[in-house]
């Protein structure tokens, strides 16, 4: 698939927006689950340091790069290996002066045969300016996830961001 066919959707509702991506991954659901919930695996493709208290009501604490956003939140749904939903509260940062107080990320994994997973990632309750900036960034992170799962060299995040930003509104 080409990058355009992998692009996500930006849904704007007033001052808020939702980003939605769907990827078909040639890996079992359990492998994908580990890649999105295990801090050592997240560090490989999501450019972050993560602490995840994996349970309903648990917490997440991420420092996500390359900007180094500090993000915390409560786990809303912990349903291995199907659903991981958590708040995404980002502290103010030079690139995000007001932070993000209400955002939520939902990862849904649906088995498609024995060794394929459909990943749907929904990033909701983002302020509109943040969503417009994050849309190509999340695309780039998901491209890195796919490369990581395949065992391929990971694409440079900044180069991927630049390559896909024309697919999204600005």
Give the label of every model feature segment.
Residues 29, 76-82, 108-118:
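A short, structured loop/turn motif at beta-sheet edges
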Residues 35-36, 78:
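Conserved catalytic core of Hanks-type protein kinase domains
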Residues 16-19, 92-147:
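Beta-strand/loop substructures that line and gate deep hydrophobic ligand-binding cavities in soluble
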Residues 82-90:
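Short, solvent-exposed secondary-structure boundary/capping segments
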Residues 20-21, 27, 31, 40-74, ...:
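Short beta-edge strand/loop motif at the mouth of beta-sheet-based domains
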Residues 64, 87-88, 121-123:
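Residue-level recognition of conserved beta-strand positions in structured domain cores
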Residues 1-4, 125-170:
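A conserved amphipathic terminal alpha-helix motif
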Residues 4-12:
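A detector for short, charged/polar N-terminal pre-domain segments
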């Amino acid at each position: 698939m080409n990058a355009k066919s992998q692009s996500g959707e930006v849904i704007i509702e007033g001052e808020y927006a939702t980003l939605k991506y769907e990827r078909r991954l040639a890996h079992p659901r359990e492998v994908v689950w580990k890649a999105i919930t295990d801090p050592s695996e997240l560090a490989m493709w999501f450019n972050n340091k993560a602490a995840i208290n994996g349970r309903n009501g648990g917490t997440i604490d991420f420092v996500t790069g390359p900007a180094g956003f500090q993000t915390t939140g409560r786990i809303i749904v912990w349903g291995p290996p199907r659903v991981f939903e958590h708040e995404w509260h980002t502290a103010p940062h030079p690139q995000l002066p007001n932070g993000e107080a209400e955002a939520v990320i939902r990862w849904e994994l649906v088995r498609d045969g024995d060794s394929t997973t459909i990943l749907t990632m929904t990033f909701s309750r983002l302020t509109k300016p943040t969503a417009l900036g994050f849309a190509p960034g999340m695309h780039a992170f998901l491209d890195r996830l796919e490369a990581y799962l395949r065992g391929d060299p990971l694409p440079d995040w900044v180069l991927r961001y630049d390559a896909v930003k024309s697919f999204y509104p600005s």
